[in-house]
Amino acid sequence: MSASTVSITASPRTIRRTPVLSGEKKSNFDFPPSESHANAAIGESSAGTNKDLIRAEAAGERSNTYDVGPVTRKSGSTATGTNTTTTQRRTRKSQGNKIDRGKWKTVVRVFAKQFGALLLLVGLIQLIRKLTLKDSSLSSSNFPIETEMVLSELESRISAVDGLVKTTTKMMQVQVEFLDKKMDSESRALRQTIDSTSSVLHSELKKVESKTERLQVSVDELNAKPLVSREELERVYEELKKGKVGDSDVNIDKLRAYARDIVEKEIGKHVADGLGRVDYALASGGAFVMGHSDPFLVGNGRNWFGTSRRRVHSKAVKMLTPSFGEPGQCFPLKGSNGYVLVRLRAPIIPEAVTLEHVSKAVAYDRSSAPKDCRVSGWLGDIDMETETMPLLTEFSYDLDRSNAQTFDIADSAHSGLVNTVRLDFNSNHGSSSHTCIYRFRVHGRELDSVSVAHA
């Protein structure tokens, strides 16, 4: 048994001893060097007093429980036989434990602060979330009403557009049906017109074919028969005998040859432009129209001044070309009086002029034929307004004669050379609106170079 144990058990229980501590007072909690410097301003006396009071209370409680005296530690020497009481000092191990405990307290304190800040932040987030959800709930409560209004307005607009589309479609269908009916009726009318026109043309072609057949038959008959029959020759012979012509002077074969020559000459005349005379006013030979009075034209033909530099209409050339007796192949001039100015293909001595109109056998109306006419001619250029135009001939066109009527120039030898001829007409056969010129011809003879030089 140790000496400390003996001292505790030997003390009577009734005696309460005051614990006396000896030795150096030290703090129960060793601060780190940084903290000890920071707390130096507070004071060491108050800290040490508080810690001594805590330590005294703890010792009193232990003494009341166990009735023991102060714990002392006796040390002796076997050599001297003496005991030494000393206060137990804290080892460096216990001081190391206190430093670790202080670090843990700092960590816990920092953690507690961070945790509190985290809790505060979480609370703020929850509060903001509740407010946001509340606002969204309020706005969502109004959303269905606005949505219904928008949807109803959209439905009304869609229905209006649908009605407009239906109405437009119906109108387009009506227009299409109307156009279809109109096109159908017009196509039927056009088809009927074409059919009627084709039937008329077909009938006219049949008439032409029949006429052609009759003409062919007539030509064949003429070719089969002699030009002069024997009966006609005998009749001519009897007449010649009555005219006191001797038999020695008359021969039937000679008469037949004479008649043949006459017929061939007449046929040659008709083949040679119908007259058998040279036309120096023929357009294909080099002649042309230099001017004319106002033409009688309708429709697009009214604008005729821009067609030529000489203010001559493009259709005026018809007056200098063969018409072949076809109605309408003429150049109409306005009114019952007018003129035509023609430049001949070459200078000539004029002998006659020919004025042609449509034949009575094929004409629809001959009231537009010219009546009283006057022809002038000269060589070169003259001023028709100031100078007198030399007169060649005057005549009247007669409807009872042939369609191509020739009028001779009485004094052609004294007229001299001419290369320009003017036809003036002062009246026609009844038409007040226009006068038609089918063809105008000028006949004469050219002089050779020697004659022209002497002239």
From Swiss-Prot:
Query: Where does the record place it?
Result: Nucleus inner membrane; Cytoplasm, Cytoskeleton, Phragmoplast; Endoplasmic reticulum membrane; Nucleus envelope
The tissues in which it is expressed are: Expressed in roots, hypocotyls, cotyledons and leaves and inflorescences.
Q: What happens when the gene is disrupted?
A: No visible phenotype. When associated with SUN1 disruption, abnormal nuclear shape in some cells such as mature root hairs but also numerous meiotic defects namely a delay in the progression of meiosis, absence of full synapsis and a reduction in the mean cell chiasma frequency.
Q: Could you tell me which residues carry N-acetylserine?
A: 2
Q: Does the keyword Iron apply?
A: no
Bilayer-crossing residues are 106-128
Give residue ranges for domain SUN: 285-447
Q: Which GO terms describe its molecular function?
A: protein-membrane adaptor activity
Which of the residues are on side Perinuclear space?
129-455
PROSITE patterns for this protein: SUN
Tell me the segments the record calls region Disordered: 1-99
Q: Which domain of life is it from?
A: Eukaryota
Q: Assembly and partners?
A: Forms homomers (e.g. dimers, trimers and tetramers) and heteromers with SUN1. Interacts with SUN3, SUN4 and TIK. Core component of the LINC complex which is composed of inner nuclear membrane SUN domain-containing proteins coupled to outer nuclear membrane WIP and WIT proteins. The LINC complex also involves nucleoskeletal proteins CRWN/LINC and possibly KAKU4 and the cytoskeletal myosin KAKU1. Interacts with LINC1, WIP1, WIP2 and WIP3 at the nuclear envelope (NE). Interacts with SINE1, SINE2, SINE3 and SINE4. Interacts with NEAP1, NEA2 and NEAP3.
Domain notes for this protein: The SUN domain may play a role in nuclear anchoring and/or migration. The SUN domain is required for interactions with WIP proteins.
Q: What is this protein called?
A: SUN domain-containing protein 2
Q: What species does this protein belong to?
A: Arabidopsis thaliana (Mouse-ear cress)
Identify the coding gene.
SUN2
